[in-house]
Amino acid sequence: MVSKNSWRSYVNSNVSTQQLKLDADAIKYSIEIDQNVIAKHHGISRKRIEIVAWPAVVSACCFKSNLIVHSHSKCLTNTKFDFRIMDKFNQLGGIKYGHTPGCENKLGHCAEQRAANDLLYKMRDRKRKIKDISFSKAFRPRTMKEISMCDNCCYVFDK
């Protein structure tokens, strides 16, 4: 869990209010996921929850459209990526089942890529660019450890 002192030092750094809200939203979502996983594991929840312990959670936001989307990292299933993201994937060699050169993460598996994809589909604005998307920090739901953006995501989102 994030301690009050570490959160205060983070808040006191020169971070925009919008970015703080986005990061707080990602933390809230991470805690919610972790509690659902614990409830499922211990049989507390009566409703059937198909949630697993995801390795990373992130929130993506386009401040110009006021949309915020949460997502998590997971294996590829029949996910159809937006053409803007696919163009960047193709520049990196396309979606494969192996690792891309220079990065341990597989294309399409990262929380940032999934959140951006969901956001671009919800915006339905073809003029928006990938660089307009802002991301929260990625967190591990169980430990609340902050995860840095991988090389693939840095390339795809020009960060």
Question: Which residues does each predicted region cover?
Answer:
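Zinc-dependent deaminase catalytic domain
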Residues: 1-159
